[in-house]
């Protein structure tokens, strides 16, 4: 905890390492830079579970690689290992015991990476890129869930090359989240499906989307009893929906809010609207972070319906984010998210992962 509770080591010391004496805005929040960041856009981040001592961070990138760092209490990051796919890596997750990392790729496969032996084996196959991967640990089974643009959701026993179950989706699979016993899947055509995972996965409910534009990211949140109770859904139109599965008062409890838009005070001027690239809930406080194509992160209190903080603007989009298991560290990736197409891609631009002390800034607003 030493550095993640002090200001020493934050400062601007991290910027001079890269030989840039000029002031630039790649790290306006003066956060800690992860060493040896990927060489192309960073699509996903995931911290190790609490079962593992210490903190380990995994990132997947469009350079087809998956990297692992140890994050020390001092804030120093040590590259530990790396694995490759033959296409961009779109998602990563951990097994509950922290011994394995699962990776999903545009090469239409998913792999299981054993960290102790540094061996990776293929565990899943789709007919199109695999968009997300989640580990499910139930009392009577454990499996890996993969979703693909081939319009299927598949569940895999890692010991078998054939899926345990295949569920057809109405459209291409865009994003998902899992907190046992709930899974939420968002598809093209603004489709939303909730699955229950007890005994075996099955469809629970289809939900009319609270958002009018393409779904981009989704994250499940818990109630005071630590049970999954709803989800936050982000779209390409700078908006997030907070949706409870069984709210006492749906019209009052479910709501949407605008975010990741240019702050034009002149209301007659057109507003720039950016995609919400990621949503992460703080594991202790239940507050949430959003990151966007505008190059900012924001922290929110959904219960008080208020914004806690917005960052300064980075010089490129924030493509992914996550919290570590106790919520002390907020990790976010600064890299091109392809939201403006290939003509805006600059291969000379460096990609960064930053670590921020999140213990205080995510505390809920005091209720008056």
Swiss-Prot record:
This protein's record includes keyword Repeat: yes
Biological processes, Gene Ontology terms: cell division; regulation of mitotic spindle organization
Disordered: annotated span: 15-34
UniProt keyword list: Cell cycle, Cell division, Cytoplasm, Cytoskeleton, Mitosis, Nucleus, Phosphoprotein, Repeat, Transport, WD repeat
SMART domains in UniProt: WD40
WD repeats: 37-79, 84-114, 125-157, 168-206, 215-255, 271-301, 310-346
Gene3D superfamilies, A to Z: YVTN repeat-like/Quinoprotein amine dehydrogenase
Family stated for the protein in its record: Belongs to the WD repeat rae1 family.
Protein name: mRNA export factor
Phylogenetic placement of the source organism: Eukaryota, Metazoa, Chordata, Craniata, Vertebrata
Gene name of the record: RAE1
């Amino acid at each position: 905890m030493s550095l993640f509770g002090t200001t020493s080591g934050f400062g601007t010391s991290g910027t001079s390492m890269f030989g840039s004496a000029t002031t630039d805005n790649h790290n306006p929040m003066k956060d800690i830079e992860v060493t040896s960041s990927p060489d192309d856009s960073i699509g996903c981040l995931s911290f190790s579970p609490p079962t593992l001592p210490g903190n380990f961070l995994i990132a997947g990138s469009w350079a087809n690689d998956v990297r692992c760092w140890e994050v020390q209490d001092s804030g120093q990051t040590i590259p530990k290992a790396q694995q490759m796919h033959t296409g961009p890596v779109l998602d990563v997750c951990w097994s509950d015991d922290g011994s394995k990392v699962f990776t999903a790729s545009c090469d239409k496969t998913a792999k299981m990476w054993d960290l102790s032996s540094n061996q990776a084996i293929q565990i899943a196959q789709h007919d199109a890129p695999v968009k997300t991967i989640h580990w499910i640990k139930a009392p009577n089974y454990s499996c890996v869930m993969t979703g693909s643009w081939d319009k299927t959701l598949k569940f895999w026993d890692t010991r078998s090359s054939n899926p345990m179950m295949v569920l057809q989706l109405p459209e291409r699979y865009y994003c998902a989240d899992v907190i046992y016993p709930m899974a939420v899947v968002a598809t093209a055509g603004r489709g939303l499906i909730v699955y229950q995972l007890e005994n075996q996965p099955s469809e629970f409910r289809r939900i009319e989307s609270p958002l009018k534009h393409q779904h981009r990211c989704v994250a499940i949140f818990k109630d005071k009893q630590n049970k999954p109770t709803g989800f936050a859904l982000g779209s390409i139109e700078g908006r997030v929906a907070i949706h409870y599965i069984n709210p006492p008062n749906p019209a009052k409890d479910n709501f949407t809010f605008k975010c990741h838009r240019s702050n034009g005070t002149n209301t007659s001027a057109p507003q720039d609207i950016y995609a919400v690239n990621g949503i992460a809930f703080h594991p202790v406080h239940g507050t949430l972070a959003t990151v966007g194509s505008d190059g900012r992160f924001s922290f929110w209190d959904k219960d008080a319906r208020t914004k806690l903080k917005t960052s300064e603007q980075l010089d490129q989009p924030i493509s992914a984010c996550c919290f570590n298991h106790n919520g002390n560290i907020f990790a976010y990736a600064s890299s091109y998210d392809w939201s403006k197409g290939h003509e805006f891609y600059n291969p000379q631009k460096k990609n960064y992962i930053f670590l921020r002390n999140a213990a205080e800034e995510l505390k809920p607003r005091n209720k008056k």
